[in-house]
């Protein structure tokens, strides 16, 4: 976003009562960009995490840099968006299984980091709710710090989150009904 456009967006938001934003980081380029925005605008906050759709063979190298963002004078407000996405998998079962395994390993590594940082966590879960819950349970993170972003599951899954102390957020997807 060019500065004039960003300024206009911030002004329009302010005029209707929106006074702060959280930019959700999904890959290394986002983290750097959003941290810079957050440094320039006191009402813009950011998160850092590797989104499951960006998990590739080099995910370990990317993820190892995330905790360093918390050592910065302007740290993220949450770890995420992290999670599992089983929606767009290849038809080839072997390739599909490789992607799922990589996403699961990456999620577990990031949950361990988030637990060590004792920070809030934003979860991306698409066609993978049960696995996400299982890995969060296994990680031992505080469920009260977990929010399932862009929640698209049913009432039973929402009750499951609430039972554990987790939360769900609803975005434009709530209008799809």
Predicted segments with their positions:
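Mid-domain alpha/beta scaffold segments of enzyme catalytic cores
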Residues: 1-177
């Amino acid at each position: 976003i060019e500065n004039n456009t960003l300024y206009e967006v911030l002004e329009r938001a302010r005029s209707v009562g929106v006074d702060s934003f959280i930019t959700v980081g999904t890959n290394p380029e986002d983290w750097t960009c959003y941290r810079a925005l957050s440094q320039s605008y006191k009402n813009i906050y950011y998160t850092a995490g590797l989104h499951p759709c960006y998990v590739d063979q080099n995910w370990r190298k990317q993820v190892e840099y995330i905790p360093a963002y918390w050592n910065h004078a302007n740290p993220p407000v949450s770890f995420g968006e992290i999670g599992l996405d089983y929606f767009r998998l290849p038809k080839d079962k072997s390739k599909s299984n490789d992607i799922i395994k990589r996403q699961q390993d990456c999620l577990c590594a990031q949950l361990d980091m988030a637990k060590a940082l004792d920070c809030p966590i934003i979860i991306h879960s698409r066609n993978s709710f049960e696995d996400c819950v299982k890995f969060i349970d296994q990680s031992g993170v505080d469920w009260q710090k977990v929010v399932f972003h862009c929640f698209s599951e049913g009432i039973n899954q929402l009750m499951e989150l609430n039972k554990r102390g987790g939360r769900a957020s609803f975005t434009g997807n709530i209008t799809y009904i």
